[in-house]
Amino acid sequence: MSNVPAELKYSKEHEWLRKEADGTYTVGITEHAQELLGDMVFVDLPEVGATVSAGDDCAVAESVKAASDIYAPVSGEIVAVNDALSDSPELVNSEPYAGGWIFKIKASDESELESLLDATAYETLLEDE
């Protein structure tokens, strides 16, 4: 079973979301997602300043197996991207919940968070796959 940190929120598309002290949200892909994709070779990051809607594809994770869209779990403005992934995309594999984060977003509608899964619901989703 994949590691599913309890403090995070999750999407059905296997993104995770963590609220930061400054009110922004950090987004990445889950350990389960990176296990399915395999070794990362490139991450196409979104543009800082871009406005996205929940469910929009806004980044791409390319691995030795496939390229997979990464979706915005909430609507808002992209306020930062993880530039370290340009040189070290493997951080998505080795540290999916830490150094392998993909972007930070300032949510425009926090009520969208209610549609995300908590750790227990995400674990149930994984069991049903």
Curated annotation (Swiss-Prot):
SUPFAM superfamilies, alphabetized: Single hybrid motif
InterPro entries: 2-oxoA_DH_lipoyl-BS, Biotin_lipoyl, GCV_H, GCV_H/Fam206, GCV_H_sub, Single_hybrid_motif
Obligatory cofactor(s): (R)-lipoate
Residue stretches making up the Lipoyl-binding domain: 24-106
GO cellular component, one term: glycine cleavage complex
Disulfide bonds: none
Superkingdom as given in the UniProt entry: Bacteria
The family this protein is said to belong to: Belongs to the GcvH family.
Entry-linked PANTHER family: GLYCINE CLEAVAGE SYSTEM H PROTEIN (PTHR11715), GLYCINE CLEAVAGE SYSTEM H PROTEIN-RELATED (PTHR11715:SF3)
Assembly description: The glycine cleavage system is composed of four proteins: P, T, L and H.
Name the record gives this protein: Glycine cleavage system H protein
Species annotation: Escherichia coli O139:H28 (strain E24377A / ETEC)
